[in-house]
Every structure is written in structure tokens, then in C-alpha cells.
Amino acid sequence: TFTQYFHDPANQYTISDNCIKHLLCDNQKRIWVGSMKGLNLYNKETDDFIPISTNGSVFWLMQNSQNEICYLINNTLCIMNPVTYVTERFQFGDEHKIYFLYEDNDKRLWVGMWDSGLKWFDRKNHKLVDANLTMENGKNFNNSQVNYIVETLEGNLMLATREGVLIYDRQANRLINYYQREQSCGLSENTIISLYRDKANNIWIGTYGGGVNLYTPYSNFFIPHKPEYKLQKSIGNINAIVEYKEKLWLGTDGGLIIYNPKDESYEYCPLHVPRSVTNNEVKY
């Protein structure tokens, strides 16, 4: 069963808006909710929500290695102390459309951009530094949209773009490989929406209408999974992937799906959200 929470204009301790953009469960098991109208923190004792920020649409949340909560509001990177709520704000110009945040094992904060590739955040100098997304053959992805980032077992960054999967060597600052549907690599769709590295170091790749692709360590090919075929149900895009109790939970346009890798079975979980415009869509 699912418990549902809605915005109530008469109650400041409800979620700020019904359009939820992102969720974060931090290392203290607290749940942060980013919506179209701000940031909320779930209060488990009172079963309601504490308003943290009402300054705009929050569309990405993460916790860094210093336990700070990092989130994006338009072109502003916010870094907040989760105890005092004191927040540093780093505002960038309109030419920098920030889309995604990821901290690697060396504690560097990487920023996926809407239309200008990959950058990393130089906190000391309050600026974004370009990463080089150019192959040795001259093929260039520096103007790509980077939707998602994960670190591979080898320490490289895998980037999700609208032009396939990119592999970036962060030590050498260069692109070392890219995969597209047109190649004989098994990738089912070029527009990649989500990435997830599981406990076995496999990387699961959520696509725009092309199901899920599995990328295993030390391989250069992808194994496509099509949940809609086994479920006989249209699920659309794979928006998010999370591992929980040895199963993968997939947030899709058509609802929540639970995948069991042991027997390769799928379970569909209908949500039945009242008054929902997007019906069963699960973003995260």
C-alpha cells in the first residue's frame, strides 16, 4: 500500500506543490522533497513536512561527502547544512543551464548541463570548469545534454545523453568511448534518461521508450530488457532506477515496476493517484 501526501494551501506543513521533481533519502534516513515550489523535509514524528525553501523549482537533490544537501534551483547551485539549514548559493548565468549533480569517489562535484556537456564545480573559486567531451577522432559531445552520471568500476564516469552513452576518463580529462544504437553494442535507444550502479557493479540504463539496458563490468556491450513485453503493458520511459532488498525498482511513465534479477520477473504496482494529471507516472 502507498500513503499519499498532497499540497494544502491552508496548511504550511504539507508539501509545497503536488508536482514532485526529486526525492532524497539522506544518510540519517530523512526524506527531502523537491517540488515545483520549493524544498520540504519530511517530519516522521508528526507525519508532515517542514518547509525549507520556497524560492523556486527544485529539480535535483543529493548529499555530498560532507553531509551537506546540494540542490538546484534554476541556474543556482544551493549547498545547505542539513542541521542549521544555512545555505550557500552559487548563481550562474543563463549560459549555464544546470541539470544534474554527482559527486565522485574523489569528492569532486560534477555537473551535467542542459546543453553544454559536462562540468565540475570549483567551490573555492565559485565557478564551473569545462570537461573535455571530445574523442581522439574529433567527435564532439561538448554541447550535449547530460541527463545522468555514475562512476564505473574502473573509475571513469558514464554519462547519459540524448546521443547515447559516453565514457569519460576524469583523470585524463577526455572522452574514451561512446555507445549508440546504430553500433553493434546492443544499446536499444540513444536517449538515455537514468543510470544506476547496483551492488554487483552492473550499470542499469533507463531509456526514452526503449526499456532498460544492462551494462556489466569489463564488457563493451549492452543487454536490453523490455519490461513491457513481459507485463503486456505500456510503460513509456524509464525515469529512475533504485536497488532495494536485492530487487530493482523502476519508476516509469506507466507506473512503478519491481524487477527481480534472480528469476528475471517483473511486478507491476498500480498507484491509483486521485486527481492526477500524469496518472501513474513515477519520476523518482
Feature roles, as predicted:
Residues T1-Y284:
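Carboxylate-rich, polar loop motifs that coordinate divalent cations or form catalytic acidic clusters
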